[in-house]
């Protein structure tokens, strides 16, 4: 039997994990084993909301060392993280300033300023990326305006996964799928857009040309002295999750469910027309030149904050209690900027419930309208797919079949690119066949008589009436 041992480092906004994958070539079987899991979270430092990158690096090294201590030969390593955030380095590779998190308020108001000065349509047609107030474009503008004293010391700007790969290998890389989340990459050239960089105040010399997934960045030398390749995987965690989504057919959509939830479909071409702009659709880079056409949804962030504030540890019990309650009594818009990082999430939700205006949730409809074809099934992947209540609500609200799983989608997609780089698999579609036969998948059938299905139908009926009367 021929085996490959690949290690995936998967960092999320609330936790990180080092996972060992064992791939058996002859039977095309893939098994995962968790080596090390650790917490991640926001910290307050010198008036900024930051990440503790030193702690994360220590946890990564601890996990890698554990694998080596077991005497396992590692064939490759890959790292994926969340998007938009970055670390600045000087000429000697030492950090400049703080690793500020996207939930910090430093970039507030700068998105509107960019739209006014550059033109909203022009920014969108250049980047194809949705407008979010914490995109790297605005974070860099905040940095260069508010901390100009740092600029003479900056030689490099590395996005989070590239920074940790650099710490392991000493080699710098700017991976394409994650680079596109910055709103700084030109959608036509796949290189940094000079006009957008100029507005941000950043120097183009801080960045190298983005590279597509599948190249070896460098090597990590393990304690035993072996040189292990570190692969540039699809380093944006959602890009990795989409690779592991067992999409079947052109009418399949995906929902990567975690702290953030991202709903969309794959396309060979981007969508940057006025309809896409009006719906704030994003065209993030994917593997093999594909685009991840999607919408950002606030996801489980609100739930995570409520659990923390109320000190609730038994999530299954809470879900069971919630399932017994009537649906749609209180509706809020979780994508409202007020929920990005409020001081007290519970109080903010209560305040929103007191307001009367209710938004119409229609991410699936906007995506379907963009394609000109309805979806027939929705693949929910990531940690959030373990929430059976949420899965059923999605099926009922969208009116289509939901297939939940795999849970560790980002990890699996990370491993998939490594196996392709090692010439064990041909392409993404080949890897998805492996996922389909090895992952635990659960199907949820929509219930048209559910309360939420009736509520969504009523909302759409109300909207159509308003459009007729306008």
Curated annotation (Swiss-Prot):
Pathway: Carbohydrate degradation; L-rhamnose degradation; glycerone phosphate from L-rhamnose: step 2/3
An individual GO BP term: rhamnose catabolic process
Keywords assigned by UniProt, alphabetized: ATP-binding, Disulfide bond, Kinase, Magnesium, Nucleotide-binding, Rhamnose metabolism, Transferase
Xref: InterPro entries: ATPase_NBD (IPR043129), FGGY_C (IPR018485), FGGY_N (IPR018484), Rhamnulokinase (IPR013449)
Residues the record marks as active site: 237
Coiled-coil intervals, chain numbering: none
Reaction catalyzed: L-rhamnulose + ATP = L-rhamnulose 1-phosphate + ADP + H(+)
Cellular component GO terms, alphabetical: cytosol
Cofactor: Mg(2+)
Chain sites annotated for binding substrate: 83, 236-238, 296
Disulfide cysteine pairs (residue numbers): 68-222, 394-398
Keyword DNA-binding: no
EC code(s) of this entry: 2.7.1.5
Tagged with keyword Disulfide bond: yes
Signal peptide positions (record): none
GO MF: ATP binding; glycerol kinase activity; rhamnulokinase activity
Binding site for ATP: 13-17, 259, 304, 383
Function according to Swiss-Prot or TrEMBL: Involved in the catabolism of L-rhamnose (6-deoxy-L-mannose). Catalyzes the transfer of the gamma-phosphate group from ATP to the 1-hydroxyl group of L-rhamnulose to yield L-rhamnulose 1-phosphate.
Family: Belongs to the rhamnulokinase family.
Name the UniProt record assigns to this protein: Rhamnulokinase
Source organism of the structure: Shigella boydii serotype 4 (strain Sb227)
């Amino acid at each position: 039997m021929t085996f490959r041992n690949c290690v995936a480092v998967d960092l999320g906004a609330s936790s990180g994990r080092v996972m060992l994958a064992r791939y058996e070539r002859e039977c095309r079987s893939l098994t995962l084993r968790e080596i090390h899991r650790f917490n991640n979270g926001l910290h307050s430092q010198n008036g900024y909301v930051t990440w503790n990158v030193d702690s994360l690096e220590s946890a990564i090294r601890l996990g890698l060392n554990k694998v080596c201590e077991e005497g396992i030969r590692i064939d490759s390593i890959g790292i994926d993280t969340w998007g938009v955030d970055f670390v600045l380095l000087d000429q000697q590779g030492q950090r400049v300033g703080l690793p500020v998190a996207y939930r910090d308020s430093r970039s507030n108001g700068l998105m509107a300023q960019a739209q006014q000065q550059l033109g909203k349509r022009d920014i969108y047609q250049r980047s194809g990326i949705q407008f979010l107030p914490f995109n790297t474009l605005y974070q860099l503008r905040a940095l260069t305006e508010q901390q100009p004293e740092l600029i003479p010391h900056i030689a490099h700007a590395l996005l989070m996964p590239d920074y940790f790969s650099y710490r392991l290998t000493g080699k710098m890389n700017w991976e394409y799928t994650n680079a596109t989340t910055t709103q700084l990459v030109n959608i036509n050239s796949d290189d940094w857009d000079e006009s957008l960089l100029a507005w941000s105040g950043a120097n183009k010399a801080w960045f190298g040309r983005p590279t597509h997934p599948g190249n070896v960045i460098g090597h990590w030398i393990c304690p035993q002295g072996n040189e292990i390749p570190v692969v540039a995987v699809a380093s944006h965690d959602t890009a990795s999750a989409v690779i592991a989504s067992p999409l079947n057919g052109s009418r399949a959509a995906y929902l990567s469910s975690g702290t953030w939830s991202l709903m969309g479909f794959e396309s060979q071409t981007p969508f940057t027309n006025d309809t896409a702009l009006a719906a704030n659709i994003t065209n993030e880079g994917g593997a093999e030149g594909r685009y991840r056409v999607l919408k950002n949804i606030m996801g489980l962030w609100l739930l995570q904050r409520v659990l923390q504030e109320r000190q609730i540890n038994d999530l299954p019990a809470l879900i069971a209690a919630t399932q017994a309650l009537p649906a749609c009594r209180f509706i809020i818009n979780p994508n409202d900027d007020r929920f990005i990082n409020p001081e007290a999430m519970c109080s903010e939700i209560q305040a929103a419930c007191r307001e009367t205006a209710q938004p119409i949730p229609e991410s699936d409809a906007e995506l379907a309208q963009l394609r000109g074809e309805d979806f027939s099934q929705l693949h929910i992947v990531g940690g959030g797919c373990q929430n059976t209540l949420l899965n059923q609500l999605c099926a009922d609200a969208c009116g289509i079949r939901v297939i939940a799983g795999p849970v560790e989608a980002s990890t699996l997609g990370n491993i998939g690119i490594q196996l392709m780089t090692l010439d064990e698999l041909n392409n993404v579609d080949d890897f998805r066949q492996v996922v389909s036969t090895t992952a635990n998948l659960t199907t949820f059938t929509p219930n048209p008589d559910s309360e939420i299905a009736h509520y969504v139908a009523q909302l759409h009926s109300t909207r159509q009436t308003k459009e007729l009367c306008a």
